[in-house]
A protein has these predicted regions:
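Conserved, structured core segments of small domains
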Residues: 1-138
């Protein structure tokens, strides 16, 4: 199973303040542990929302709003993608993360089988082609 581990943005992150050398070293060690255990698949940190944009879809209308998104109470600051056997395993790994003050959400990623008969063989082949192309770029 794959899980997205979503780290909520902090005031410091939204202000563009980067973590200290010590915090980065602790997180680097943690990421190495995840990698050695075969859990770690991907990790990305996000720029502050002031450098982002939102696009709202309503029928054929597209409305773009530039950041920052100060009205939002929960912004994403970054994420991991993990491979674990269960939600409990993912939570267990997360409990060992070297965060001092953070809120983190874990969500299971849909697998192809979750979509049932609507995910036809043709759609499955299309997704496999797209994934193969993306992986070749990495």
């Amino acid at each position: 199973m794959k899980f997205m581990v979503i780290v909520k943005a902090t005031k410091n992150g939204e202000a563009g303040k980067l973590p200290s050398k010590e915090v980065q070293a602790a997180m680097g060690k943690y990421n190495e542990e995840l990698t050695k255990a075969g859990v770690f698949l991907a990790l990305e940190r996000l720029q502050p929302s002031s450098r982002g944009a939102r696009v709202k879809f309503a029928g054929n209308t597209r409305t773009v709003t530039d950041g920052p998104f100060t009205e939002s109470k929960e912004l994403v600051g970054g994420f991991w993608l993990w491979k674990c056997d269960s939600m409990e395993e993912a939570i267990g790994w997360l409990k060992h993360a070297p965060f001092e003050d953070a809120e983190v959400e874990i969500r299971q990623v849909h697998e192809a089988e979750d979509f049932g008969e609507n995910f036809t063989g043709e759609l499955r082949e299309q997704e496999e082609r797209v994934r193969a192309t993306v992986e070749a770029r990495a």
